[in-house]
Structure formats: structure tokens, C-alpha cells
Amino acid sequence: MPQTRLTDRFGRTVNYVRLSVTDRCDFRCVYCMAEDMTFLPRQQVLTLEEIARLARNFVALGTEKIRLTGGEPLVRRDILELVREVGTYGLRDFAMTTNGSQLPTMAESLRKAGLQRLNISLDSLDADKFRAITRTGNLSQVLDGIDAARDAGFRGIKLNTVVMKGRNDEEIPELIEFARQKQVDISFIEEMPLGEISEHDRGLALCTSEEVRDIIRRHHELIPATEDSGGPARYFRMPDSEVRVGFISPHSHNFCSTCNRVRVTVEGRLLLCLGNEHSVDLRRVLRGHPVTDDKLQEAIIKAMDLKPERHHFSSNGDVQILRFMNTTGG
């Protein structure tokens, strides 16, 4: 792995890239997108070859960790071909975030293709609540997907739960017990103010990480984990389990000072910060210079100067970023 060349003006090293492969999804989660979402025209979406080229050049610039995101990555046709290709790039960490719906049939193939870790969204263990949050999701299918991932030999499996008051906050103890039973880590996430939603008031629904910890501590002691997560989560352990409990707290405890990541949307926009609109059009560079990579790497390096010191999310429920999470890359 080469010495990184991606450093922003605040001295932060950027070695983690989240690549969105689609804005489409078979769910319509209330915190992620509108129910009648209009998806991008095909011609605006990067080809899998373009995504692989981006990944290859980020690795050439020192990237050690790549996560494939969406939308739902597993609804992208021929996604296994991309996984096989990126899996040959010598990454320290190669992961995917998924809603789990396609894992019953795809988990084993993903593991054999070289994917190392999976983050699986699980916002409820109640079938009716799960359907209400996802609008279209089938809980049993996702639970089967979690089992399929374990059976396929994935050792780095983590559950992600977006906690919302009045929707799923009372399920926190049950979700902890489920993670302990399955021997997988779980992270609780404060809802992020991306895109205008109508299902609930984000300010009223916000459940802070400290509130979640207070609920868990009624049942389990939480001991801060010593290892570096390499991401935004702050991890804790329980004395009687190897399972880690993580907290991603963009509102109550932002992780900006140690931010080591950027995102590329499926349109090829390089986003320097989840909570800012600063971006660089890498699709134009990819298609304008299809043969050589010099201009592409130059654009990526130069873009680091645009990375802001921090985001400015507020907890009042207002929309701070107009783009939805599915177009950002979850």
C-alpha cells in the first residue's frame, strides 16, 4: 500500500472512501428517502467500470478502506463483478452496507468474491414496525440474510440501527439481546438531517446516543473499547460478551476532528463531508479523460482542500442538506 497522498488542510489523512453504486433500493426507509422517490436517469449513473476505476485510483493515492454503499448495493446488476474486481486491490478493509434483503441468496457469493465485512441495517425486530419504517421491507427476509452472512463465513458483521423516538427506541434492549445472540456488533445511529421527509419531525424523534446508552445501562454495564474503530462509531463492550455496541453521534458528539473519509455518489460527485454540499464532479473527469488517470488523481488530490473542518448539523429537525441519504451514499 503506497504512502497516502490525501491530506486535507487541517492535517487529517483521508484513507477511507465510501463508493455509492446505486441510488435505487428495494426499501423506502422513512429517514432515507421519499416514498415516491424519483431515481437518477441511467446515463447520469457511473458504470461499474467507472466505479472500479475510481476505486483503483483512490487506492493508488493511499486509500486503505473502501465501503460500497447505496441505495441498496445488491440491487445493482452485476454487482458481484465489481466486488471481485475491487477485491483484488489489496485493501486493508473492504466492506459493504446493505439492508440485508438480498443476502439470503448473495451472501456466499459476496464472501467468495472477496468482500470482507458487512454492515446490515436493522431498525426493528417487530415485523409491523419494520414494515412501517422501511415501507416495503420484509423482516423475516432480512433476518434470514443475517443468518446467511454468518453461515457464509463473514466475521465482520455489524448491525446498524437508526434510533427514533416513538418508532423504535423502546426496542433497544431487544436489539442488544439479538446482537448478543447472533454474536455480531451493533451500532445505534442518531438520525441525520438529509432530505425533506414527511413521516415524522426529526427534532422530536431525535434520540441522542447518551439517551440510548442510559437505556442500555439499565440492563448491561458498558465499558469503553480500547481499539480504534477506524470510523465514526465510539464502541463499548459488555463484561459478559465479545459483542461491541457502537454509537454514531453526528448531533451530540460529532466525529469531525478525526474524520478520515470521503464519499463518491453514484453520479460521480466527490463529497468531502456528509454534512456539507461541497463536491467535485469526478464523472466529468472520468469521461473527459478515459485513457489516462493523471487528471483524475490530480482532481482527487486538489479536492482535499475543499474538505471543511466540520459539519454543522443541528438537532432542531430542520433539513440541513437537501440531498437524500440514498443519493448521498449511506
From Swiss-Prot:
Keyword Secreted in annotation: no
EC number in record: 4.1.99.22
Species the sequence originates in: Marinobacter nauticus (strain ATCC 700491 / DSM 11845 / VT8)
Ligand binding (GTP): 18, 67, 97, 158, 261-263
Top class in the EC scheme: lyase
NCBIfam families: moaA, PRK00164.2-1
Record note on cofactor: Binds 2 [4Fe-4S] clusters. Binds 1 [4Fe-4S] cluster coordinated with 3 cysteines and an exchangeable S-adenosyl-L-methionine and 1 [4Fe-4S] cluster coordinated with 3 cysteines and the GTP-derived substrate.
Residues annotated as binding S-adenosyl-L-methionine: 31, 71, 121, 192
Full protein name: GTP 3',8-cyclase
